[in-house]
Curated annotation (Swiss-Prot):
Location of the DNA-binding region in this protein: 77-96
Record's protein name: DNA-binding protein Fis
Membership in a protein family: Belongs to the transcriptional regulatory Fis family.
NCBIfam families assigned: PRK00430.1 (NF001659)
Quaternary data: Homodimer.
Keywords assigned by UniProt, alphabetized: Activator, DNA-binding, Transcription, Transcription regulation
SUPFAM superfamilies hit by this protein: Homeodomain-like
Role, per record: Activates ribosomal RNA transcription. Plays a direct role in upstream activation of rRNA promoters.
Gene Ontology MF, one: sequence-specific DNA binding
Length: 101
């Protein structure tokens, strides 16, 4: 669903490399990237009905996010869970879901 540009934007936002003039990361950048990707997805559907879009979008964002966070923490699940704001058990379930365990 997402093109390589969107994956790159997610990566840069996750590791904090996109900054504004004030040096602050703007969540709006990620929102805009997701909006562009979903808009492109529907444009490619060419009028066909889409199903389970919510779950698809979540998995398309969640999988690379988890991958990047795990790389950033060098596989430390406790640190990764803290960064994500979830408990370690939830992180382990999500990693298993995407085959990252």
């Amino acid at each position: 669903m997402f093109d390589q540009t969107t994956h790159t934007e997610v990566h840069q936002l996750t590791v904090g490399k996109i900054e504004t003039a004030s040096g602050a990361i703007k969540p709006q950048l990620l929102r805009d990237a997701v909006k562009r990707a979903v808009t492109n997805f529907f444009a490619q559907m060419d009028g066909q009905e889409a199903e389970e879009v919510y779950e698809m979008v979540l998995s398309e964002v969640e999988a690379p996010l988890l991958d990047i966070i795990m790389q950033h923490t060098r596989g430390n699940q406790t640190r990764a869970a803290n960064m994500l704001g979830i408990n370690r058990g939830t992180l382990r379930k999500k990693l298993k879901k995407y085959g990252m365990n």
